[in-house]
């Protein structure tokens, strides 16, 4: 289980001294206001944004974590709680950078990471509630994240490697989102690259079944994204998935061992009771 807490996110290592105790992590968290703005783009289209303006005073990491702990009050299994708290710190640092601007690829990346992390969590209802508490603690809209991730996934499933990178020559809602990202990444607006964005790109390629290695190069070029950064962060992501699998296997083994111990303990009193009754029967026969 220790493997999961050593995820190689640089931001997580910097924030290690802010990690809450297990008791605190088992509490839950509070809601913040969603900061949304809408900018018309190309006629009637609108692009929804979650963005911190220059005049905003960002909350501290401690305040964001406290919001989460207030909003979700049920205990979270420690193997999940540790990583969630570390991811929350990392995402807080991204969220309140002056260049941060929400986009659907980022949302897809985070949703992908979250769903991979929480796969196998005992309760689907709790898993959804934790997601809502997490995103709300960052003053963003959890429903927007899910809706945008779903739209991106549906679009990617209808694409192939070539059509994926030719978005700039096409019209459509998702194409408009990708064009906007490309323009901002080129310096025509606010854009802050992140590992979640890299995972979002990876997910698009995966769903489009774009296995040709050069497709990622072309997509990064079309989006004006540094391919070397994407490669590096996808290696980190794959490493995380590997650690998650190992940690969950350890958790499964631990749960099975504890279950077996409980069953053995429950059987022992019954055996003692049977022996006592047998001895009592022998005594009554002697008399």
UniProtKB/Swiss-Prot annotation:
Keyword field contains Plastid: yes
NCBIfam families cross-referenced by the UniProt entry: PS_II_psb29 (TIGR03060)
Annotated Basic and acidic residues bias: 256-270
Protein location: Plastid, Chloroplast outer membrane; Plastid, Chloroplast stroma
Swiss-Prot/TrEMBL keywords: Chloroplast, Coiled coil, Membrane, Plastid, Plastid outer membrane, Transit peptide, Transmembrane, Transmembrane helix
Assigned protein family: Belongs to the THF1 family.
PANTHER family tied to this protein: PROTEIN THYLAKOID FORMATION 1, CHLOROPLASTIC (PTHR34793:SF1)
Example of a GO cellular component annotation carried by this entry: chloroplast outer membrane
GO process annotations (BP): photosystem II assembly; protein import into chloroplast stroma; protein import into chloroplast thylakoid membrane; thylakoid membrane organization
Segments on the Cytoplasmic face: 214-287
Pfam family for this entry, one: ThylakoidFormat
Function in brief: Involved in a dynamic process of vesicle-mediated thylakoid membrane biogenesis. Required for the normal organization of vesicles into mature thylakoid stacks and ultimately for leaf development.
Location, primary (coarse class): plastid
Organism expressing this protein natively: Oryza sativa subsp. japonica
Chloroplast intermembrane side: 1-190
Transmembrane annotation, as ranges: 191-213
Domain of life, source organism: Eukaryota
Organism classification: Eukaryota, Viridiplantae, Streptophyta, Embryophyta, Tracheophyta
Region Disordered: start-end pairs: 256-287
Protein name: Protein THYLAKOID FORMATION1, chloroplastic
């Amino acid at each position: 289980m220790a493997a999961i807490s050593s995820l190689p996110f640089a931001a997580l290592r910097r924030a290690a001294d802010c990690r809450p105790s297990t008791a605190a992590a088992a509490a839950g968290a509070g809601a913040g206001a969603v900061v949304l703005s809408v900018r018309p783009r190309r006629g009637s289209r609108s692009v929804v944004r979650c963005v911190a303006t220059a005049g905003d005073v960002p909350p501290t990491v401690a305040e964001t974590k406290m919001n989460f702990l207030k909003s979700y009050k049920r205990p979270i299994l420690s193997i999940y709680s540790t990583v969630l708290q570390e991811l929350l710190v990392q995402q807080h640092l991204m969220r309140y950078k002056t260049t941060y601007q929400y986009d659907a690829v980022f949302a897809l990346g985070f949703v992908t990471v979250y769903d991979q992390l929480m796969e196998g969590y005992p309760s689907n209802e709790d898993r959804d509630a934790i997601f809502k508490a997490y995103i709300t603690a960052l003053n963003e809209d959890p429903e927007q994240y899910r809706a945008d991730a779903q739209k991106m996934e549906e679009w990617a499933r209808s694409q192939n490697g070539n059509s994926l990178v030719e978005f700039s020559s096409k019209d459509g809602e998702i194409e408009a989102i990708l064009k906007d990202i490309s323009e901002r990444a080129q310096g025509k607006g606010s854009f802050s690259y992140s590992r979640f964005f890299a995972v979002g790109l990876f997910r698009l390629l995966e769903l489009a079944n774009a296995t040709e290695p050069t497709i990622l190069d072309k997509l990064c070029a079309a989006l004006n994204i540094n391919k070397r950064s994407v490669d590096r962060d996808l290696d980190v992501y794959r490493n995380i998935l590997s650690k998650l699998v190992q940690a969950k296997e350890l958790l499964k083994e631990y749960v099975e061992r504890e279950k077996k111990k409980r069953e053995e303990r429950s059987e022992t009193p019954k055996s003692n009771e049977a022996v006592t009754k047998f001895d009592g029967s022998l005594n009554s026969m002697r008399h």
